[in-house]
Amino acid sequence: MAQVQQVPSSPMNGIPEKNGNGLSIEESASTAVAALAHIQNGAVLFHGTPTKDLNGASTSIDTDDLQLSPSDLRRRSTRASALKAQEKIKLKDDIVQGPQKRANDDDDMEDEELGDEINEQSAPKKRRLENGKEFDQTCFRFGLRANNEGEVYAMTDESENSSIHESEMEVVRYHYEKMKNKEPDEEQLRERLNMRREAENQLREEEAKLLVLRKMKDSQTRAITKLAAETKAADLAEATSAAYKPAVATNGKSVTNGKNSMIESNNKTMNGLKNLSIPQQLELLQKLSSQSPAAKQAYIMAKKNPAQTTQLFQQLITINNQNLQKQKELSAAETNASASASPAVQQSQQAQQPQQAQITQSKLLNQQTPAQRIQAARLAFRAQADKQLTTIPTQKSQPHDITFLPNPNASAFLALHGLDLVVQHVLKDRSNETPYAGPSYECEECKTECAHTWKAIGSTQDDLHLYCENCVRSAQKRKNRTDQTALLKRAFQKITAQEKLLQEFEKKIAEGQLEQYAEAKAAAPATSQTIPTSSTATVSSIPLVPRLPQIPSSTGSSTPTQAVKTSTPIHSTPKSSSSSAKKTAAQLQQQSMQGMNQLFSTAMLRNNPQMQQMLQMYQALAMGGGAANMANNQMAMLFQAQAMQAAQAQVARAQAAKAQAAQAQAAQAQAQAQANREANQQSMLIQALMSNGQVNVQALQQLQKLTPEQQKALIEVVKRQTRK
């Protein structure tokens, strides 16, 4: 048996080799000694192949150390071959990956060294903000923004805030939120107010420009419309030539003038047509062809022979003028016929008009149901009530409680609170101030002694009552409230009376008496116009006495009488005797005589001969005819009443003129007296100011009563005298 020598395993690059079971080569070799094969010729064999060490030298093994059976050697040799194959694979991987791993290790070491150097010497950062607590959002470098989650970040690298570290970002976020929620200071508010005012001024200017443009457009439109209307009227006047006069008022000159005007208009038209070309004349004829058959015939002929267009136009104008003349003659004949109609026909037509209106009204009333009539009456009442309420004037503005000093340019600046007295009291030099030695003022209403303004109210200078400003204003307010309340009460009373009438009207409608009421109203004027022809004739329900309600009596105790209106017509009854007629005629004659006497005396005083003559004629007619003639002669009564009314109107006008003249004279005298008083007061004030330079309380009160214009004039006079 040959001896087997154990071969020690050499490390590869200092790393011991391991087999697949995780054991090193030495351990596997010690356990696999029994697996070695037989050694022939003094060499170790693995499956009959001699082995070498890692350096290529042959290995000699002492065969005396170990003797194994063939089965053990076979088993051990198989395991050893597997281990040897694994060793070869590892050796190959070590040869390929060894230099790369060493290079990677060297790079890692160099990177670590460079990182240490960079940490020791870091690159310079970007320029930071001078003050991190303030940001200018208007600057383009302000790149901080906040997202929906509230996180603040830098938008671009150009932002000055991009160099801020993460540790400083919390401070930046805090100041940014504080700046966003910060309230504006006074300067910012002032700037915003100025910007707002500038924007409002610009808006007003734009609105003013727009308004001016609208007005200009409207004026241009009106001018164009007016020019078009004037042009149309001028064309119409030229077309219809001169105005037509009826045959009754015409003479030879007017006829010749009309013919001359027609000739002139024809010449103008022909001159205008000469300026047009033949195609334009044909186009004009085509437009006129739809108006008359003659123009259509002329257009057809001109289309066949365009050279005769001007002559056809002249013929067409002549035919048109002849037609116009015929129409004027026909209208004049109709006017003359209507003017020559009898006045009786016109009077009958005028008399039929009220009857037709009454018939139409009755038909309308018959067509409506009672409910519709009541509804219409209520609507009319409501419309009338609304109209009355809208006519009520508004309440007068209440006087304001002034607790401040108004504008110095206002008229009530000095007279309101006595500002001049306050200034004199505050000044250091009190030489101009004169103390008031009299008793203190006291209000007659509230008995107060302290008021900033006093009011002296009275009809004359000797009858003046002193009141404070508060009492005067409260009295004015009470008066305004009382007047408004009285006005509303009167309106309410009117509406209440109308409501009562409406209720009565509705009651009549419900009872079916509306037709009778309407017939009574319609029969009232007809019965008033009936004239009795004899003493046995019926007496009208409404006599003629109301026609003379305004005739005054000599004693002045007469009152006008009014006709009594009833819902149903009162039928006249025949008289049993003429005593009542005689009494009525006597009373009527007495009243008329009294009125005539008064008017006659007035005419005598006024020296009006025409009025005297007319009244004498009417008086003689009345006295000569007697009572029966006065009752029968209604026309004379009517003339007499008209004459009396005219005389009364003349007397009233004369009295009004006299009263107006007296008022004007009194006003002139009062104005002259007021001017004299003001002149005297001004002279006294000037003397007081120029004498000692001191002003007493009365002078100050007079100065306060002056208007600003009077005060300015007084100051100018004082300045002029001081200069002299």
Swiss-Prot record:
Q: Where is the composition biased (Low complexity)?
A: 332-358, 565-590
Q: Name one GO biological process term.
A: positive regulation of transcription by RNA polymerase II
Assigned keywords, A-Z: Activator, Coiled coil, DNA-binding, Nucleus, Transcription, Transcription regulation
Report the coiled-coil segments: 186-216
Tissues showing expression? Expressed at low levels in excretory cell, pharynx, vulva, and posterior neurons in adults. Strongly expressed in the excretory cell and more weakly in the pharynx in larva. Embryonic expression in the excretory cell.
Q: Looking at the record, which segments are called Disordered?
A: 1-23, 55-129, 328-361, 523-590
Per the record, where are the segments of Acidic residues compositional bias?
A: 105-119
* Ranges of Polar residues composition bias in the record: 1-12, 56-70, 527-541, 551-564
Return the GO cellular component terms, semicolon-separated: nucleus; NuRD complex
Compartments, as annotated in UniProt:
Nucleus
Statement: the UniProt record of this protein carries the keyword Transmembrane: no
Biased composition of type Basic and acidic residues is found at 85-95
GO MF entries: DNA binding; DNA-binding transcription factor activity, RNA polymerase II-specific
Q: What does this protein do?
A: Transcription factor which binds to the 5'-CCATACATTA-3' motif found in the promoter region of pgp-12 and activates its expression in the excretory cell.
Q: What is this protein called?
A: Transcription factor dcp-66
